């Protein structure tokens, strides 16, 4: 049972929630090159150089995207154990494998939407091929755009006639911190989509979707290409 102190929040049972949350984040290239370290009142997300396959991801961009997705799950887990998560990206330049930290900053209650998203995060999500062939309704797409915006990214809807809605997640600028933000936005999109009966397939290789470049604003960089399909009526 967790004690009233923040430092005591990460008992064995609660720490296991963070491990599960990180493990269920999406990854391509069959990479699971991250590891979580639980400290008093803090969870750190590290790159694991032993498991990282540089040949498949030479810039470690996919690694950062996947770790960003794990980071979003960790934030949900923090709310479930009753603490406000405070995230720092790339908190220590002297330790380049330390990609992010989540500090448990004080007691709080999780919101119904967070509890629903957390429950959804514990189920495997489709990651490559969408099921369903209908474009989601515009109000739902707008809700998904808002979910991505709250993570510091933009979801651009691309022109398409029929079938799923093609879109791209973009960030202002590029580099490790932008990749981590895009990963959090991707996981938010996956979970909010699942709650709204929308499947989300994704590719980190945005170059395969040339139309993504046409939708960008000055200074934006496309990070993830997605297809959004309605799965139920």
What are these regions (language model features)?
Residues 1-233:
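Acidic, surface-exposed loops and disordered segments
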